[in-house]
């Protein structure tokens, strides 16, 4: 009996070690491509000489995978588009979380969002979804603007669309955007564990959100603006709309667990591993829901493990009962009030023709800072 117990213990340790290694592999690859936001520019793509053409050379500091490099070489202009999309995602993340304990801090280097990407919490889910959405949105827009040589407007919609309108114009190329988003972003995921499935799900949720937020725009034709006939096309939403939708899904994110129907094997085509809600009474998450598998840290104190700075020194709202209020944002530690001088433009006048002149007015305001 003791021998059996000992062997079972060894098996458990081996499984845990293998799982830990799998997680490490996934962590080492996840989000590496985000580093392009700090180094990507036109100078990172170097063409060969006219006398002896050679393949494009990418700056090694980008630390991209072979598939990602191939996509960049095959689609001139796409590196800049992906970089713009990542910048948009970072701005959107900081905007939506500006008043929360975790305010989407970013830094230099390859791990732009820090060690939070190694976790499996709600914040991690939002980061993966918004960055995937940013790439999809930016690439789709770049196609219709002619910034990427290998794609253009989406001309699949043609002909009559209804009794008084027809498809035409230049629809944003959402399908090419989703293709690049999937091939470029998802290729950085490695492993066969829960984190791998969760990251892929949230990447897909980000791309689908861009698709579902697209809207039809039309232009009227007819005598004296009668609008007897319209030409319509599909237009990408403002990226703020995408961020709003993903923030709503962050608030309603589903906690999930890994399921392979009790099998110890990775799975087969007929029975692949999948995500299930941790609470069996909850519905399965949809393809657009954000998912996570561990509770978020409280983000109150600096954490080397999570790479988060804590909330000391953050400006809070002393009259708010919400997340930006001093009681919640400062985690009960209290706050200090400081007088701060603010200089603003004032007493502006319009001068013919054509400029505006203003004075600089200085005032004092009280700000509250977490201890």
UniProtKB/Swiss-Prot annotation:
Disulfide bond entries: 93-104, 143-151, 153-170, 218-232, 220-227, 300-331, 316-326, 330-370, 346-361, 348-358, 353-354
Domain of life where this protein originates: Eukaryota
Broad class of the protein's primary localization: secreted
Residues bearing glycans: 28, 261, 317, 360
GO molecular function: cytokine activity; frizzled binding
Region entry Disordered, spans: 261-281
A cellular component annotation (GO) from this entry: extracellular space
Post-translational modification note: Palmitoleoylation is required for efficient binding to frizzled receptors. Palmitoleoylation is necessary for proper trafficking to cell surface. Depalmitoleoylated by NOTUM, leading to inhibit Wnt signaling pathway.
GO process annotations (BP): canonical Wnt signaling pathway; cell fate commitment; forebrain anterior/posterior pattern specification; negative regulation of DNA-templated transcription; neural crest cell fate specification; neuron differentiation
Assigned protein family: Belongs to the Wnt family.
Annotated protein name in UniProt: Protein Wnt-1
């Amino acid at each position: 009996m003791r021998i059996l117990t000992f062997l079972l213990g060894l098996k458990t340790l081996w499984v845990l070690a293998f799982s830990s290694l799998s997680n490490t592999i996934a962590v080492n690859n996840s989000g590496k491509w985000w580093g392009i936001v700090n180094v990507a520019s036109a100078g990172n793509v170097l063409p060969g000489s006219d006398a002896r053409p050679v393949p494009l050379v990418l700056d090694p500091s980008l630390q991209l995978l072979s598939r990602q490099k191939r996509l960049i070489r095959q689609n001139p202009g796409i590196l800049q588009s992906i970089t713009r999309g990542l910048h948009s995602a970072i701005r959107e993340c900081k905007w939506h979380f500006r008043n929360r304990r975790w305010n989407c801090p970013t830094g230099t280097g390859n791990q732009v969002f820090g060690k939070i990407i190694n976790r499996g919490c709600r914040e991690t889910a939002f980061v993966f979804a918004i960055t995937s959405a940013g790439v999809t949105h930016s690439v789709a827009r770049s196609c219709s603007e002619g910034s990427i040589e290998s794609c253009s407007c989406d001309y699949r919609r043609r002909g009559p669309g209804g009794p008084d309108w027809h498809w035409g114009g230049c629809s944003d190329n959402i399908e090419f955007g989703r293709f690049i988003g999937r091939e470029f972003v998802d290729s950085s995921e490695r492993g066969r564990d829960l984190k791998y499935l969760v990251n892929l799900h949230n990447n897909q949720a980000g791309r689908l959100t861009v698709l579902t937020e697209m809207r039809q725009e039309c232009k009227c034709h007819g005598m004296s603006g009668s609008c007897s006939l319209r030409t319509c096309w599909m237009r990408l939403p403002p990226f703020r709309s995408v961020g709003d939708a993903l923030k709503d899904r962050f608030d309603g994110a589903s906690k999930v667990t890994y399921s392979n129907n009790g099998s110890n094997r990775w799975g087969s085509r007929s029975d692949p591993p999948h995500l299930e809600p941790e609470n069996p009474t909850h519905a399965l998450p949809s393809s657009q829901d954000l998912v996570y598998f561990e509770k978020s840290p409280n983000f109150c104190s600096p954490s080397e493990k999570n790479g988060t700075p804590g909330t000391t020194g953050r400006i809070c709202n002393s009259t708010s009962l919400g997340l930006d209020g001093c009681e919640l944002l400062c985690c009960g530690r209290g706050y200090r009030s400081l007088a701060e001088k603010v200089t603003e433009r004032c007493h502006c006048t319009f001068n013919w023709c054509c400029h505006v002149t203003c004075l600089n007015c200085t005032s004092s305001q009280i700000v509250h800072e977490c201890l």
